[in-house]
Each structure stands twice: as C-alpha cells, then as structure tokens.
Amino acid sequence: MTRTSKWTVHEAKSNPKYFTHNGNFGESPNHVKRGGYGKGNWGKPGDEINDLIDSGEIKTVFNKTRRGSNSQNNERRLSDLQQYHI
C-alpha cells in the first residue's frame, strides 16, 4: 500500500500542442500579427482601393445620398393634407 491516490481518477484531457505552443494565449495559431500591418507596413487586404481612389485612378463608389425613412414621407403627406383647403 504505497500509493494513496487511485489510478481510476484521470486528469482532464490536455489541449493539442498546436494550440498550446504557438502564438500568444487565447490567439489562434495562424493569427496575423497587428491585423495585417506586418513588417514593412504592407497593410491589410483592401487598403490599396483607398489609395487608388485618392490618386483618382478609380471613381468613388459610395457616393449615394441617404434615403429618407417612410416616417418622413408620411409626415410630409399628412402636412400636405392638413394644409389642403377646398
């Protein structure tokens, strides 16, 4: 009787080495450092579009005016009805 703990009690299953030994804690192992602004400041995918718009090579795409809501249209119609005289 040299052992006091039973062999039937097992510890929790450990995480795979892939997740425990690569990168920082709580990060996926294939995480890109600084969100893509890596060595040489090469930027994130899609940043080149803003550069092309600024240089004038392509036109701006998001130049639509904001649509009014239905409540604004309804208010205008009600005010027109109230101002209508027979």
Swiss-Prot record:
Superkingdom, taxonomy of origin: Eukaryota
Cytoplasm recorded as keyword: yes
Residue ranges of the region described as Disordered: 63-86
Compartments where found: Cytoplasm; Nucleus
Residue ranges the record marks as coiled coil: none
Keywords in alphabetical order: Cytoplasm, Nucleus, Phosphoprotein
Chain positions with Phosphoserine modification: S28, S79
GO cellular component terms attached to this protein's record: cytoplasm; nucleus
Stated role: May be involved in inhibition of the reverse ATPase reaction of mitochondrial F(1)F(0)-type ATP synthase.
Protein family according to the UniProt entry: Belongs to the STF2 family.
Subunit composition and interactions: Associates with ribosomes.
Miscellaneous section: Present with 504 molecules/cell in log phase SD medium.
Protein name: Translation machinery-associated protein 10
Classification lineage: Eukaryota, Fungi, Dikarya, Ascomycota, Saccharomycotina
